Amino acid sequence: MITETAHAKINLTLWVGRKRPDGYHSIDSVMHSISLSDEITLEKSNEILLTILEGDAPAGQENLMVRAAEAFFAVTELEGGVFLTLKKRIPSGAGMGGGSSDAAAVLRGLSKAYDHPLSKEDLLKVAAKIGADVPFCVEGGASRCQGIGEILTLARAWEGLPLVIAMPPLFMP
């Protein structure tokens, strides 16, 4: 069994450009991982199954963790599946990359479980197909993110920076 930590992220800066033909917006953002996190366990299985142990998250195909596992097995052409558990602490709809970080954790965990069948570059390409924030969440830390979020330039982390994050009672899908 493998345990992965899925850290929330915040946007320290964010510029949003025009909507692209693929439905995404061009962005230029500085993203930073924070200590708030979800916990994911992965265990090899014959099928892809997700159990939510704590918190609120979509199940089945609506969950980015399931999509990440499906994408990993499709690209690697490996037989099998994974039993996933989720302890959800990152609030849904808060813009903190909860679903994206969970998907990234699944990609990292599957890569470890199956002895790294994809290069880092290929893993990031799979991540970009799942969602715009997923490549950053695979890497974590601090990065300038451009394109739709898939073009990463490492930045210096702001360790120890005290932050107060308030979440109003609004949900942003």
What do the predicted segments below correspond to?
Residues D28, V82-G95:
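Short pre-catalytic strand/loop immediately N-terminal to key active-site residues, enriched for Gly-Thr
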Residues M65, A94-K120, F136-V138:
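DPxDG-like acidic metal-binding loop motif
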Residues T13, E43, T51-L53, F83-K87, ...:
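Solvent-exposed beta-strand sheet faces enriched in polar/charged residues
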Residues I2-E79:
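N-terminal beta-alpha supersecondary unit
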Residues F73-T85, G109-I130:
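Phosphate-handling active-site elements
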Residues I2-T5, N11-W15, K19-S29, H116-P173:
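ATP-dependent small-molecule kinase catalytic core of the GHMP/sugar-kinase superfamily
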